[in-house]
Amino acid sequence: MDAQIENAIEIAWDPTSDQALKGQAFEFLNQLRTDPQAWQVCIAIFTRTPRTSPVVRLVCLEIVNHAVSSQILDGQGLGFLKQSLLEYVGRVYSGDAQDQVDPAHLQNKLTQTLTYLFVGLYKEGWESFIDDFLALAQKENNLPGVVMYLRILGSIHDEIADLMLSRSDNEARRNNDLKDLIRERDMQKIAQSWQDLLARYSHQNDGVVETTLKTIGKWVSWIDIHLVINQEMISLVLPLVGRTHAAGSGDKVRDAAVDTFTEIVAKKMKPSDKAEMITFLNLREIVSQLLASPPLNEWKGTPRYDTDLAEAVAKLVNTLVADVVRVLEDGKVDNDTRGKAEQLLRDFLPSLLRLFSDEYDEVCSTVIPSLTDLLTFLRKVGQLPPTYSEMLPPILNAIVSKMRYDETSNWGNEDEQTDEAEFQELRKKLQILQKSVASVDENLCIDLLSNLVANMFSTLEQQGSQMDWRDLDLALHEIYLFGELALPNTGLAQKSQPNPLAAERLAVMMSKMVESGIANYHHPAILLQYMEICTRYYSFFEDQQRYIPQVLENFVRLVHHDHVRIRTRSWYLFHRFVKTLRAQVGNVAKTVIESISDLLPIKAEVPGNDADDDMSSDESDHSADAVFSSQLFLYEAIGCISSTSATPPADQGLYARSVMEPLFSDMSVHIERAKAGDPQAVLQVHHIIMALGTLANGFADAHAAQQGKRPQPHEAVSNEFSRAAEAILIALNELNAIGDVRAACRSAFSRLLGVLGAAVLPQLPQWIEGLLSRSSSNDEMAMFLRLLEQVVYNFKSEIYNILDVLLTPLLQRVFSGLSDPINGTDDEIQLQELRREFVSFVQVILHNELGGVLVSASNQGTFESLISSIIDIAKTLTHGNLVASRVAFNVLSRMASQWGGPDVATIGENPMTTGAPAPAIPGFDQFMIEHFHGLCWTVLQDGGFRPNTDAQSRQILNEIAGIQQVIYSKTGDAFVNHLQGVTFPQLGIDGTEYLRLLTTSREKKPVVTWLLGLLKGRR
């Protein structure tokens, strides 16, 4: 069998093997894993001499591992395996062996096997496990034995003590027992072995020393700390911390020694013990010496700077400060311990801020958690004593300084986009820290930041364009953030009132900024910041309107900037600025339109085959599509400033026409080419339609803001946009087979609603004909139904006749979509969306008292299909359809209320029927009982309906209870007789209590509770 196994492994891992043969080999090896005898053959193959190939030995050992970990081996088998591996290790790793030691990957696998045996036999069966491998490490000149011993110790920790791994309760108990046994039997000798190895190899083998230190760092979390914190051990580790290579290269031993101290400090212990330990280890001196060492001090700012060491020290300081803060947060600590902790905090704060200010952001980020903990603690203290308050200025200064671009940064360089993104992420973290400082001492932040900004403007006045853009950017960035102090409902405190001092300082900053001429500075980052700030603090310009012409002039100039990142971002910011200040800038609408008219022509570019599909859509995306998306903001901006209340309607129409006429001409030129299949022409038509819709959105948004309700645009405006709608409908009629064109038209239609008013209604049949073509997907139909809901709501008093004409063809398209075959997940999702929007559309019709249109002479032919479709949706309880089901039940309940006639039964303590049903539609009373009521019990009996455990199903149950009550109110005794004579006998239940609740309880809850109990008892 040995040869068969070896052959199978060789075939399976040979890339040149026949695929069919390889498949057979893998199948054979998988069978071996479950064969209770295979492990014996495999261990023999692994340990035999001469050795077979490494891949065969590795796979054999993997099969053995599987057998041990899955507990295939009994006690006798484990004993045999122990003896086999112990003999093998003694033969290969004894130091004087003839056999060569295994390569690293095989040693790892062997260590794993031995660790599994340790778990299974250390308690009973291999009590000498540690001694056996320690003996190898203690032999003179036996480096392989030392490495194996340390590998095993590391693996044991990973198996039984690694807190990052999730464990079952049984595994956790087993691991705790093993740790207790180790502490009892072998921990003293293990700790002594670490000392011996450090002493023996400190000047001989860095690899052994590094591994020993890492092993100590792992084990220290669960052993007696005094085994590590003693004079002998410290005297061995300290020299390693202070090592410096003359060449300036990294030192893994030194870094590991620092990490070991970090793990020691992180060990959980009483606050008083933690403070004592930090003092005993003299970590303040250690950290200070490390930060003063050449790799972190003399070589700062050079390629020799040791970032690995800096990160290691940062981890140590982060752990130290976090632990000291935890001591201070503990309200139960004695005064002596608190005093020591406060002194430690003062001792380590300079080191913390030095690392926080490190030029490498990864070093800075390492200490942010402890700085956050410190600031959180200070915020909880309340009124700060001088001991704490004197810490804040250096902390805030460090935060602000770190927000500055470093000297090597090259803003806007395409090659540095990743660095730029990382820096912006760091700025977000720093902003949170700055907020934390403000929450502790707001006035300190106000004063420091005010001085920073004032000094910047003073320097700008003196140096002009010679001033470093990084300093300007920092000051502008702080102005941008300053509003969180000055304005209400911002920052950590969520203030309901602004800070008067901060608001006053912000107003001064804004005035200085506008007056400084900074908008003419040469660096693009500064220009962007300027526009961002003007847009953010638009309320300043509402109060200080004298600055608006100057700022608006700057915006008009900057939207023409030749830097693409500025130009496209400025289009959006310009739109935001004029939108929020439309009332103040409307008087110069004509001038603004003329000034930016050269930016309005649309030039669609078809993406090439090499276009980056993953291109970001943010401001760093300069693709043609992204540029056009930004260009649309200009159209909306024009709509905003053209439609203010101060602008005469005739002028509004004139402005709209001046922008749209070139678009009409351009579209008429491209439609014929688009019909011929020219992709550029299709895209051009798409873009023009989007621009028309976006312009309309600007007008509609302005009217809505003025009226605070459904806009009623002036005839001069609606006439112009009626022409736009006609032009779009022409394009839609010619190109409605093209999905992108339909999407653009649908978007434009939704935006035109606000400026067309009731004038849109006569065009509705054309919109439906165009947007719901044979090519339309269910997703498109769902989106259009959502738009029609808006139309019905806005024009409910005028829409009846139009709705009466268009309803049947509309519903026929919807019915067709509902019955389309499903091919894959996307189709299923689109169908769910169509179901939801269909029943929501019918719900809106009924809610707005337009239900008569559903049963009018024009639409009677589709009424049966309408009801049938709604019932089908109501009883479809698949995942993703429960919302549609609930709405469908609500729709049926509304139909029952509207067409069931007057109430003939009263619900109360003495229920009674006062007459025969008189439905508005003949026969509808019996229809409700048979179909609506029958539907309710069909759903209740569905195994997938679980209202006891699912919230959405519970909502459906509420609707079911509601519709049952409506049916009873409309039909009275006829419904009761049906329940007693048909429903209850068919279900085999006693419905007496249900009938009592249904006829006496005006609330749905008792009925729902009874139904829940029924379902719970029957499942």
Swiss-Prot record:
It is found in: Nucleus; Cytoplasm. Pfam families: Exportin-T, Xpo1. Gene3D superfamilies: Leucine-rich Repeat Variant (1.25.10.10). SUPFAM superfamilies: ARM repeat. GO terms for biological process: tRNA processing; tRNA re-export from nucleus. The keyword Cytoplasm applies. One of its GO terms (molecular function) is small GTPase binding. It comes from the Eukaryota. Its main location: nucleus. One of its GO terms (cellular component) is nuclear matrix. Keywords: Cytoplasm, Nucleus, RNA-binding, Transport, tRNA processing, tRNA-binding. tRNA nucleus export receptor which facilitates tRNA translocation across the nuclear pore complex. Involved in pre-tRNA splicing, probably by affecting the interaction of pre-tRNA with splicing endonuclease. PANTHER family: EXPORTIN-T, EXPORTIN-T/LOS1. Belongs to the exportin family. This is Exportin-T.
